[in-house]
């Protein structure tokens, strides 16, 4: 490439960049309108999650926990009857998979909402900012908890598949029957625990967010009224 071509390309790139910058519209707050629109949209979504979704999820997951009881006898009967899958476990697992994916989506919205409200770094009262950072960390921890449960689902199917393969090869070995039944029972107990864990995530986060909503939206708006977030 000649120096003339390089100069021409550089000039073209500069022109494109200038055109792109020129196309950005600035709002009254001094910020690009696209970013202001994004912040407004996220705030609206976060409000819906806080006021509507989170209370409903607490009730929904509590009911799911109460309605998902089983026993070791049920799990063993599933294996003895020749079923390749434990329908009770797989149905609850699929329901919780949807619940976890929704939790992750909602917590991502709330975390972005909190982060978009964090002000510029200044000296003075940063108490509200520390609350924002604390709750953003709690939202991330809740998301990671959900992702952790998803990993256990994959491991369950892999482990059970190996046991089923051995059972088909040695159908008269009673230990394989009992091993699969024990695996199913343990998984069912963990899934019920998952119901409570998801429920508790929603409940605790809802409580913390509603108690500190003013500080989350305007962290420096209460400079003369500093108190504990708890």
Regions found by a protein language model. Name each.
Residues 38, 49, 135, 146, ...:
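Generic structural signal of hydrophobic/aromatic residues within well-ordered alpha-helices
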Residues 42-61, 103, 146, 153-156, ...:
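Charged, low-complexity, helix-prone segments enriched in Lys/Glu/Asp/Gln
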Residues 78-89, 119-132, 174-190:
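Short, charged/polar, low-complexity loop and linker segments
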Residues 165-230:
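Alpha-helical oligomerization segments
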């Amino acid at each position: 490439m000649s120096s003339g071509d390089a100069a021409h390309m550089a000039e073209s790139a500069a022109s494109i960049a200038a055109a792109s910058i020129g196309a950005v519209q600035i709002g009254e707050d001094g910020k690009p309108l696209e970013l202001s629109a994004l912040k407004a949209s996220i705030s609206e979504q976060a409000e819906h999650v806080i006021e509507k979704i989170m209370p409903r999820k607490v009730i929904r997951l509590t009911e799911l926990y109460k309605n998902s009881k089983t026993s070791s006898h049920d799990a063993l009967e599933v294996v003895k009857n020749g079923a390749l899958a434990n329908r009770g476990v797989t149905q609850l697992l699929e329901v919780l998979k949807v619940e976890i994916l929704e939790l992750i989506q909602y917590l991502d919205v709330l975390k972005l909402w909190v982060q978009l409200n964090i002000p510029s770094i200044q000296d003075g009262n940063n108490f509200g900012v520390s609350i924002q950072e604390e709750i953003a960390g709690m939202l991330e921890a809740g998301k990671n908890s959900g992702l952790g449960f998803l990993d256990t689902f994959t491991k369950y199917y892999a482990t059970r598949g190996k046991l089923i393969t051995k059972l088909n090869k040695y159908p008269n070995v009673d230990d394989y029957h009992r091993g699969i039944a024990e695996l199913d029972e343990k998984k069912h107990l963990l899934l019920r625990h998952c119901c409570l864990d998801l429920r508790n995530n929603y409940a605790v986060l809802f409580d913390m967010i509603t108690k500190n909503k003013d500080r989350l939206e305007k962290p420096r708006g209460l400079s003369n009224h500093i108190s504990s977030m708890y």
